[in-house]
Amino acid sequence: CTFCSYSRLIKKRSEGWEYTLDEIMDIVRSFDNKPVTEVHIVGGVLPQYDVKFYVNLFKAIKAHRPELHIKALTPVEYHYMFKKDKVSYAEGMKLMQDAGLDSMPGGGAEIFAPEIRDQIAGGKCSGDQWLEIHEIWHNLGGKSNATMLYGHIENYSHRVDHLDQLRRLQDKTNGFQTFIPLKFRNENNQLSHLSEVSVVEDLRNYAISRIYLDNFDHIKSYWPMIG
């Protein structure tokens, strides 16, 4: 994605890193004596991270510490692995649920409008696919969050369209718990030539989100983006 400041492609692969299942479990075990209630897992779309990998990971976490709530992966990752492993969204999400998935984070939404999404996040699942995977998860009884990346090349109409699609799905499923506006940060990415929006614009965006998404219980301020 053009707004990403941490991904590393093949030419700079040595600067990147990836965890094995055992390494992830070592991280989980490092919190054994601490009052942790949730493990939050997100990552990239790498070939070795397939359906089997995550099924085994979720099962391992639950076997080690059954009370931990697993909030894991966005539709971007699910779309990639389900397509690669030739399983439907419904089949794939049921496999994840049976393995121990408790909820989904809200990442990967960016902006749903194709004319913007194709420019900033080409190659990711579409906005419609993002919404479809969340709807399937909600229909399985699962809960999830939603996000919107703002302050880049989109305009107000794109933001309103994004909020409207979330609101309509929430009216249908009531499966979203929290909406998280994500402010575009321009350091170390392909959109560094863009200025960041003002704090006043941030406040306006939060206010409009709270008013319009009256069917969402929570609006969250994400400190790495807004702090």
Where are these regions (language model features)?
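Glycine-rich, proline-tolerant flexible connector loops at the mouths of alpha/beta enzymes
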Residues: 8-12, 42-51, 114, 186-190
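Short Fe-S-cluster ligation motifs
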Residues: 26-44
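Conserved C-terminal portion of the radical SAM core fold
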Residues: 43, 65, 98-109, 128-190, ...
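Radical SAM/AdoMet-radical enzyme domain recognition
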Residues: 1, 36-38, 51, 55-148
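Short, acidic/polar
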Residues: 21-30, 87-95, 163, 227
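Canonical Radical SAM [4Fe-4S] cluster-binding loop centered on the CxxxCxxC motif
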Residues: 1-23
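Short glycine-enriched, charge-decorated loop/helix-capping segments at active-site entrances
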Residues: 15-18, 118-124, 193-196
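Acidic, glycine-rich active-site loops and adjacent beta-strand->loop/helix elements
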Residues: 45-46, 76-78, 152
